[in-house]
Amino acid sequence: MDVRGYVDLVAQGRIMEALQVIRSDNPFPSICAYVCTHPCEDACRRSQVDKPVAIRALKRFAVEFGGDRMIQAEAETTHHEKIAIVGSGPAGMACAYYLRKLGYPVTIFEAHSELGGMLRAGIPQYRLPHQVVDTEVKRLTQMGVEIRTNTRVVSLDLLFDLGYKAIFITIGAHQSLRMGIEGEESPGVIDGATFLREVNLGLKPSLGERVAVVGGGNVAIDVARTAARLGAHKVNILYRRSRAEMPANPEEVEQALEEGVEILFLVTPTRIKRENGRLSITCIRMELSEPDDSGRRRPVPIKDSEFNNEFDTLIAAVGQAPQTPGDFRLRIGKGSTIQIDPVTLITNRAGVFAGGDAVTGPATVAEALANGRLAASRIDDYLQHRYPQVSKEGRQKLVGDLLPETIEMIRKIGRLEPPILPPEARAKDFETVELVYDWEAAVNEARRCLRCGMGAEILFQDKCASCLTCLRLCPYHAPYLDASGTIQIPPEQCQACGICVAECPAKAIVLRKPHDRRLVTEELEHILKSAAESKLTPFIVGFCCQYGLFGTGTLASLWREAKAGIWIVPVLCAARVETEHILRAFEMGAEGVFIAGCGEQCARDNTASSVCQRVEKVRKTLVQIGLEPERLQAFFVDTTGENPAEELDKFVEQIGGLYLASLVIQEVKN
């Protein structure tokens, strides 16, 4: 997933392009935008400066803004081998999507009335509305995937008899684990998976006023918050470890506490007894010792610390496991998971593949989607009689940590959290808790991205004259001379401001994706040609930063529509506009040139000073060739400005006056 790419496009206001980047690697981004655990944010280097970029929330903004505009075209059938997918969770849906793109006829068999598996049955609607799942399911039908709901597969042999050449088992992990304590069969004790499934089907289980939830994972938090929404007056989570060891998403835990859920840490039930219509639960306090196999510190009972509590309902959410029908005749391993070949994903039966939670045990939606995509590739290999080609290259090399001195030079910008409903409002119903950014907030949050690995590199070492210009001008002190006297620019320290690229006299330095000075040059030449053909006057060229106010497109479009003769060249930072670009515009007849950059909202502190220095240098050149220095201006405006075009209006008026004066002078000469 090209996270940097789509975040950068959001920062420029190019939302539909950002959505295209997202969809190129994720078939169901709407689902991930709601429930992804965003491990990418844990790896975000912005956290070394202040807080990570809100990557998942930006994805949510992109899919909310443009999702309905992207229609999934039906895929062409190029293969005759039919494939059956048993189960319709995220792994099954992803596998169907990619197999259909490969040209296979695909049928999904789902035992329940609607597709989605745990997405629909196990995640509360305040986190993932059913209509979001419906939207992604619709894309499958648009592609030509055949869907058979209310169809429980009892025999794989029957599917083969029906002509299916490969089967993908993705039945999830819906079986709740037992607590293993006395009295857990008592009336009033239910399991978390069943409880969430019933609520998602529209049922309203009777819970009483006091509810205990046992567990510390995401399911336990979902159960507790759901119970509170169903009217329980008091909801207690009993968790045997401390909050630091709690595997649930920290954001979800915090929201549960805000909604009135209480968590009793270092407590576990040991016995349940039904008395006088209520549950008497005996608990014991725990202490933490050495880490266990999970890496978390192992809870140990404290002697003589037992105590009793009364509840109306106890909901156990201590884990889940797959429940594979015996008639499938599949080899089952640890945790009731299906055993597969780790490379081919084939089970002990020829033509039968398995994946998702049925193989891994409960995992994340993102992991299930990735597994479904891999399964599609492996099934294709099997049907085409190829052995899977396993890449030996490994993951892309990570960019190293920022140096402390670099961190000090990077501007601190507070993270913009997406808005959420207040606790008193969200605990009343199942409305979506987290709302979506507005346009300005999304653009500003995306601008916090450091664009790691997209900075400068010396592409043409033979051109480098070792003039040390880059060393002198870099505000982050990234370039250095190595032992051989060669300039090096470490990618982990470069902040992609582009100053060295614009100032390098030998043009030996370039910026990695997504910027290339050649693209700016080509765009400038295209605009200069169009301007010459239009004969609009006065002819003014504006180099506009694509971020901030310009990223929204508002100001640039305003100038294009209201100011005849203004031609906009988009750049990824005002500091990247080179002297050659400015002089080229004047060479081709421009009466005026301006550079428009961000004001106080700029993600970098040095942009304005760098641009102003370059403008002053070019103005001296203009004087030398007989042009007025005021023909070149720089503007720095923010989205918060009352009249961001005011300075430009004055500039256009000034250039218009110079243009008319030049006509008079020309007339006198003639």
Q: Where are the predicted features?
A:
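Beta1-alpha1 glycine-rich phosphate/pyrophosphate-binding loop at the start
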Residues: 2-12, 19-22, 52-56, 81, ...
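Glycine/serine-rich phosphate-binding loop and adjoining beta1-alpha1 elements at the start
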Residues: 4-75, 139-141, 158-198, 433-443, ...
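Glycine-rich dinucleotide-binding loop and its adjacent helix/turn
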Residues: 61-76, 135-150, 176-230, 332-350
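Flanking helices and flexible, charged tails adjoining ferredoxin-like Fe-S electron-transfer domains
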Residues: 53, 59-82, 105, 120, ...
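Feature captures the FAD/FMN-dependent oxidoreductase FAD-binding
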Residues: 77, 82-86, 134-181, 271-282, ...
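FAD-site-proximal beta/loop scaffold in flavoenzymes
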Residues: 187-209, 292-362
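Iron-sulfur cluster-binding cysteine motifs and their immediate structural context
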Residues: 1-12, 33-62, 107, 111-114, ...
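A conserved FAD-binding loop/helix module that cradles the flavin
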Residues: 358-385
